[in-house]
Amino acid sequence: MGKYNLILSEYLSFIYNSQSAVQIPIYYSSNSELEDRCIEFHSKCLENSKNGRSLKKLFTEYSDVIENATLLSILSYSYDKYNAVERKLVKYAKGKPLEAGLTVNELDYENNKITSELFPTAEEYTDSLMDPAILTSLSSNLNAVMFWLEKHENDVAEKLKIYKRRLDLFTIVASTVNKYGVPRHNAKYRYEYEVMKDKPYYLVTWANSSIEMLMSVFSHEDYLIARELIVLSYSNRSTLAKLVSSPMSILVALVDINGTFITNEELELEFSNKYVRAIVPDQTFDELKQMLDNMRKAGLTDIPKMIQEWLVDCSIEKFPLMAKIYSWSFHVGFRKQKMLDAALDQLKTEYTEDVDDEMYREYTMLIRDEVVKMLEEPVKHDDHLLQDSELAGLLSMSSASNGESRQLKFGRKTIFSTKKNMHVMDDMANGRYTPGIIPPVNVDKPIPLGRRDVPGRRTRIIFILPYEYFIAQHAVVEKSVIYAKHTREYAEFYSQSNQLLSYGDVTRFLSNNAMVLYTDVSQWDSSQHNTQPFRKGIIMGLDMLANMTNDARVIQTLNLYKQTQINLMDSYVQIPDGNVIKKIQYGAVASGEKQTKAANSIANLALIKTVLSRISNKYSFATKIIRVDGDDNYAVLQFNTEVTKQMVQDVSNDVRETYARMNAKVKALVSTVGIEIAKRYIAGGKIFFRAGINLLNNEKRGQSTQWDQAAVLYSNYIVNRLRGFETDREFILTKIMQMTSVAITGSLRLFPSERVLTTNSTFKVFDSEDFIIEYGTTDDEVYIQRAFMSLSSQKSGIADEIAASSTFKNYVSKLSEQLLFSKNNIVSRGIALTEKAKLNSYAPISLEKRRAQISALLTMLQKPVTFKSSKITINDILRDIKPFFTVSEAHLPIQYQKFMPTLPDNVQYIIQCIGSRTYQIEDDGSKSAISRLISKYSVYKPSIEELYKVISLHENEIQLYLISLGIPKIDADTYVGSKIYSQDKYRILESYVYNLLSINYGCYQLFDFNSPDLEKLIRIPFKGKIPAVTFILHLYAKLEVINYAIKNGSWISLFCNYPKSEMIKLWKKMWNITSLRSPYTNANFFQD
């Protein structure tokens, strides 16, 4: 257990290394006698340190505490002022500082100049182009690296090499930072003008990225890649990532497939030993040479050399190095441009009249027909969601910005806020709520903009549209998505599939007479040429749909939707440029509408169909699959003859020429063996994912706390690790220590222990063992979990005041009235709670809750107080089960080939033994009969928590619940009286438990939990018919077996003899499980 605690203690003595520094460990125990000793020990420690006496004697005297109790936290205090970083840094700053090239980037402000050259005065200064947007500082990052280096300077053998590589790279960073001095951050972890004016503008974000990269160096190759990226990204803040990652789109087409996995009829992956040769025309090699030349022009040497060497034999065995380069390129950090440049980027494309009108017509018609196909059924059947579209929209309204700040009155409280949900309430209270009028976004009311920053691409703008647009689009989009869910062409939406299924789909039809065409259409989505045909196609589809129904409300829904499209054809945006706000006519499609994802998918499908219909005039082929996935589309074409170099080249040129006829600036490629799209790439018949999540720089600031961000950091580290980019774990743990520590006063700090941060409680941040989610069952673990549950949710005065106001109450009761046919407390309370939770995105409320949370936490970390609780957690259930299992050794042979080469060995081993899964386990209850019944008659969507509560009520209460939601009495009676109801009980419980156990997150999402190989390691004699109990016993056993295998690389077998008498007790308990939300579960959700 104690690796984290050990590092923590070492870290504290590294940071506070002066005479005046003291570390006081705080222990706790669930055993009351030992707990008394813990308290005694603590007070004596405090007394001794106050009087400047040593604590050594106490450690001996209280050895019973130190050996048997659990470490809760470490209290540390130190009176030295905090310029320790600068002092320590000097030791490493022995190299030559980097000099930034001042003309490397096209846009002046993207050059890494001294801040005062870019922003002559404090008024002009903005940190928005270099803000790391993370609640940890450069000085903490430097400390974490120096701590690691000091700790490892006596390493030997291979470890010594790693130390030397990192030391060498850190010398570059330290020397450069030291030349200008370490920039000091303010309380919000921002870097102000006074601090930055005499330093290079991008110093902080560059140093963060560089630290992230150097702490991810293990091999010599890592070192070469990192050194090159660190040195060049100091000057090149614009195109470096793009240059380095461009070749991948061609590299995937060069590797022969020798055995691969394909999707079979049952949608499972099955091995196929087919051989497919990579057929590569010379033109492709010329394009690749050009890319490598561009890299060399930009000053890269080692990376192009590695690619060049790999090209000699293009083997899949050495391909992971290419994958590594591709992933590393993203870690140079986000490219953050000025909004004006981001907007003008899309408007720079010259508009030509010289386009193929015939193709545009076909494109528009395909969009129209697809829209009709998606909505035909719900419209013809006067679907209730389309009738009550406004209510549905209100219920799922987010608390994001509505584009302008307004003064709002809630009772006696007046606040300023930009949040949609508050604006809706305020408008309703003041009679300004008119969802039937879609406000124009023309020159009189231009659209405010948000931004999306991503490494290696230009900044994109996002429309922040008035909430009326959301309400008008919500229901129609939801219906389209339901259609897309059972249409395989829409890879992104396709029912519960994951990326492995899409992988098997592509490899399935690859053969010597097939080629795959893959296109990145992100340029097209935001190009001007797309906007008219795109919106017109949708409008025409809506017009046709309106003629299929006589229901006035459905027609109204379709008309409002149509109005959003009409308004957006004449859109202006407002862009702050300095202190003026520029209005620009913006004729392209931007994200920000509810329809963005769905409509782009429709358009991209229409686009590739248009192109294929053109080239089918010239070639004869069968289209085996067409897929669209976000900004990418791909299709596998099967010819009647074997594919030759000439064919590939001709098809490739014809496809490009076809796109050019629509003036679509897209990157279209043709290959016989692999594809590369934004989300994944396939090479040599294996699947790869880009491990490009930045750890020490964030895209934007939200209202998450340091604890939340520590959990997100860990979660990002895990995702990268699964995808083949590993950062030193000790470094990650050090960051977690820094980010979860709580300041009491200037010189007093409290550092939570591993137990606090890894126990499944409302404060969980990480797992003590990567990839293994532990649910503690020891006395001390359950004790601390209870203690934390008592202080989980904090009150906020502001929130209570708003919730008590008539504005808020009337809004909530209006929603309930529209939704319910009779009284239903569960739903009414649910709506009120949801609406109250939305208030959290209003900063003053989240700050107030955070303060309350921290003061409660401070008390708890010094002395945990438990409370008697009737609440049962998943831990309690597992604790009851555990004693009845007996373990024995077992053996499982490796029987599947590798298909995801980047996985860590211990995870790979498990997949090779038990197989992988291509589907998401249903964990939201949406497949249950009750959920389907509700969605048939009501727009209300109960959460899995609510379904779990409802399904365990008495039958007559369930009937009332259903009837109040508008389900006809006869249907409600039938449901409760049928077998389906008892199946539902089981099904919902199953979903709920899967949800609690995070079965679709981390590496668990890769394992086949229904594998017969896994099943045969588990023996549970069947007693009595309680399926729910059998289920939880089996699931627990599977997790135990898998966790053991991840940890030890070997298998165990479990035998369970669960007494019949206990079964009914356990079954009763299973209907009272409380779900725990923590920074850790939020981070998992955030990944999604």
Curated annotation (Swiss-Prot):
Gene Ontology CC terms: virion component
Keyword field: Magnesium, Nucleotide-binding, Nucleotidyltransferase, RNA-binding, RNA-directed RNA polymerase, Transferase, Viral RNA replication, Virion
Enzyme Commission numbers on file: 2.7.7.48
Coiled coil ranges: none
Catalysed reaction equations from the record: RNA(n) + a ribonucleoside 5'-triphosphate = RNA(n+1) + diphosphate
Localization: Virion
One matching Pfam family: Rotavirus_VP1
InterPro entries per the UniProt record, alphabetical: DNA/RNA_pol_sf, RNA-dir_pol_4-hel_dom, RNA-dir_pol_luteovirus, RNA-dir_pol_reovirus, Rotavirus_VP1_C
Molecular function GO terms recorded: nucleotide binding; RNA binding; RNA-directed RNA polymerase activity
One Gene Ontology term from the biological process aspect of the record: DNA-templated transcription
Required co-factors: Mg(2+)
First-listed, main subcellular location of the protein, grouped into a coarse class: virion
Domain RdRp catalytic span(s) in chain numbering: 501-687
Function, in words: RNA-directed RNA polymerase that is involved in both transcription and genome replication. Together with VP3 capping enzyme, forms an enzyme complex positioned near the channels situated at each of the five-fold vertices of the core. Following infection, the outermost layer of the virus is lost, leaving a double-layered particle (DLP) made up of the core and VP6 shell. VP1 then catalyzes the transcription of fully conservative plus-strand genomic RNAs that are extruded through the DLP's channels into the cytoplasm where they function as mRNAs for translation of viral proteins.
Family: Belongs to the reoviridae RNA-directed RNA polymerase family.
Quaternary assembly: Interacts with VP3 (Potential). Interacts with VP2; this interaction activates VP1. Interacts with NSP5; this interaction is probably necessary for the formation of functional virus factories. Interacts with NSP2; this interaction is weak.
Annotated protein name in UniProt: RNA-directed RNA polymerase
Species: Rotavirus A (strain RVA/Cow/United Kingdom/UK/1975/G6P7[5]) (RV-A)
